[in-house]
Amino acid sequence: MLNESFRPFNQLLYGKSTYRFIKTLYSIYPELKGRVSPSEERSISSNIFEKLPELFFDSPDYEHNIGIYGRENNKRVIKWVSRKIIDDHPNLEKYKVLLPASNGSGAIGEVLSTPLVGEPLVGYTQTFISFGAFDNKKEAEYLLKYIKTKFLRTMLGTMKVTQHNQSKEVWKNVPIQDFTANSDIDWSQSIENIDQQLYKKYNLSQDEIDFIESKVRAMD
């Protein structure tokens, strides 16, 4: 199914540790020194809202205008932080798709836990990873549809044997797609129909299609 022109979807992946604080954070806020280990001082860790609560606010204002998507009290939340203490990132000001850095058990075709489109000026803690850096929201929405396909999750399952989604390695068998209006896939269709287009594009046999359709749960 894969050929010499194959390009992996992981080219669009931004890992769980790619959002970081600036180097001078603890010069600006010396009172925060010692709250986190020296090796993780710039990390926007999964528990950063509890570790450094002074930096984060429940709603945006003129200064605190960057959202950080994370978890608090076992729920997904967005907290707001000053732009001046967040390092530059390729998709901070772009549309992207966020999904958990860990999910499930590694079983082939398992459902991915509630991926979503991330708006510009929203980053994330180490709980999440992201795909893409789009000026056009529609392209991010189409990438989200691709992530929900049975085809993609089957290809992901060929390498993913644990709960971890964050490494490029586990995504290396997933082919990249064109999410623009020039794509050979009609992304405006239902996810079920998109799967049928992908089966045809990659010349899957009827046995392969039957396997995917019987083993892989649909995602809404």
Annotate each language-model stretch with its function.
Residues M1-T125, F134-I185, Q189-Q206:
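C-terminal substrate-recognition regions of SAM-dependent nucleic acid methyltransferases
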Residues F128:
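Short hydrophobic/aromatic beta-strand or adjacent loop that forms the aromatic wall/cage
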Residues D207-D220:
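Short, amphipathic C-terminal "tail helix"
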